[in-house]
């Protein structure tokens, strides 16, 4: 069989794709179906009723600055040569990032050989004529939000504003993608310290927009974007080459490690923004403070949650006899009852301690550690918590 030159080139290109492209399943899908992915999904729902200023939230730093988008063009140069992420914006969301950071610049974009208009682009440091449009980043967020599996998710979208005052353009681009999903600020204010994810979802919304740079003079942007995080704390790292060089002269900072994630949440940090978020370095798994490894497993119809000796959770038979986790709603402290009983007796046993006590479930790592200490002070190694899936298997709920 004779092949012409073009056929040979096409066959070579196809073979190259087959050789270079991974033949295994999507690693992000594998992660989502793993225990870590499922446990994080369950954990994100625990704190829906509590203020976001008390939540533990994984995010990514400079979400758009990913090696996935790295490219060079003969006429316009290279983009994202010093990346901080390995995956696309959408895949970072799929891995559990709920704080997304996009740096939007009003800068030149080469649209053809003779056209270099200014556009809103996503760029880090020195912008390139080849950088992606801001709308491309918004489109990835939009695609993730529209997935039926994500209708109960809430994200914070942080816009680092270098738009040179093009706030109407920026507003139009954001709202045309997911305007009906945005929880509006209503004016120049930080995110309220009492705002919960349940409140956002009850309004039919999913996106809380924070734009830095102060209050916008544009009425539309002013009414949509929050101007600060308020009492929500945030820590981040900078793994770029430029950032590393800066550390040499500034005395250096440690990278965020798995232990940093674990200890940071235990100390009460709200948002931890990772560079190079991936499924294999242990930092995502370190964000899990609730369910123990391979739990819940519904062994022998276990439908009620308890905390055991190491502070992690297990699903147990609801008729087992354990102490009860009671939270003081006045000062936020925890007590483990001296009395024991089946899970259903939790509310009554906590109320017996006083009207300020309720049968409760920890909603962040710091609270979970406080309950562990209270349990140990009582002399027990197991305690019931107010969390169960008795009505529908796998749908874990806090009983009101």
Language-model-derived ranges and their functions:
Residues 204, 214-400:
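Extracellular, disulfide-bonded carbohydrate-recognition/adhesion ectodomains
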Residues 2-11:
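Bacterial N-terminal signal peptides that target proteins for export
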Residues 100-102, 385:
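Active-site flanking residues adjacent to catalytic metal/cofactor-binding acidic residues
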Residues 195-197:
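Extended amphipathic alpha-helical segments with heptad-repeat/coiled-coil character used for oligomerization
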